[in-house]
Regions:
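Substrate-binding pocket helix/loop in short-chain dehydrogenase/reductase
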Residues: 94-96, 102-107
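The beta1-alpha1 cofactor-binding region of Rossmann-like NAD(H)/NADP(H)-dependent oxidoreductases
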Residues: 34, 56-68, 100
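Active-site helix of classical SDR
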Residues: 118, 154
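Conserved glycine-rich cofactor-binding loop
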Residues: 9-10
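C-terminal helical subdomain
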Residues: 180, 197-234
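Residue(s) in the substrate-gating loop at a strand-loop-helix junction
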Residues: 138
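Conserved glycine-rich Rossmann-like NAD(P)H-binding loop of the short-chain dehydrogenase/reductase
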Residues: 23-39
Length: 258
């Protein structure tokens, strides 16, 4: 059994690698930094011994790089059993003041890279009628996000895409499972990269990773959450006016700005 994880050099992606290793999976770990991936690989092998861990460098914001990654994996390993689209980042600030190039990179990473990987590997999984795809979304995908407008919008895309694909698979009775996992604040490097501090207490990355992997295998929900509190927020977002949720998000993000 093979699990491919993007953004595996740190945070949730790294901790999910340990979760899959604990379940007996061989791993293909992907990130932009081979040096950091080597450290993760060594940690996993030290803990689990015989676990096969391959590391591959890929910038998932670049379509050609993503296509090359897929082709290389197909040639070397054939079909995989699990794809975890974890790579992603955010930024905080007024939309008209944040850096355009960073916005484009965020969209390409959070949406385009995930989209291409999902399509390519899903096509293979559908042919053999088995496999799992886990897209790491966010509670941010359920509401407008003033001061993090681009990030919130990218995560909304992930949730909607996943729901749509899941329906397509269901109507043909496919055994392939696709799901979107939506954490709230997590104690990772995300807040540093996004230039924010979380106003709510974040969950540990290891706890979130365990919940995410357990949900993929033990739940039949297409969209699921990292805690009851985060699920309640998502439910509120469905019933409250978007103007109200936008106001709440704005006040939350404003407190987070350093």
């Amino acid at each position: 059994m093979i699990s491919l994880i993007t953004g595996a050099s740190s945070g949730i992606g790294k901790d999910m690698a340990f979760e899959f290793a604990d379940r007996g999976y061989d791993l293909i770990l992907v990130a932009r930094s081979l040096d950091r991936l080597k450290e993760v690989k060594n940690e996993i092998i030290k803990k689990y011994g015989k676990c096969n861990v391959e590391i591959m460098k890929c910038d998932v914001s670049n379509v050609e790089s993503v296509k090359n990654l897929y082709n290389d994996i197909q040639k070397e390993f054939g079909n995989i059993d699990v794809l975890v689209n974890n790579a992603g980042f955010g930024d905080c600030g007024k939309f008209y003041e944040t850096d355009l190039e960073k916005d484009i990179s965020m969209i390409n990473t959070n949406i385009l890279g995930l989209h291409v990987l999902t399509k390519l590997f899903l096509q293979d999984m559908v042919k053999v009628n088995k496999g799992y795809i886990l897209n790491i979304a966010s509670i941010a995908g359920f509401m407008p996000g003033p001061l993090m407008a681009t990030y919130y919008s990218t995560k909304a895309y992930v949730v909607r895409l996943t729901r749509a694909i899941a329906k397509e698979l269901k109507v043909v009775n496919s055994k392939v499972r696709i799901a979107a996992f939506c954490p709230g604040p997590v104690n990772t490097d995300f807040d540093k990269n996004a230039n924010v501090t979380f106003s709510l207490k974040g969950q540990s990355s290891s706890d979130v990773a365990k919940i995410g992997v357990n949900g993929l295998f033990k739940s039949n929900k297409v969209v699921y959450f990292s805690s009851i509190l985060i699920r309640i927020v998502a439910c509120l977002a469905k019933i409250m006016p978007e103007s109200f949720m936008a106001n709440q998000a704005y006040m939350t993000q404003k407190r987070k700005l350093r």
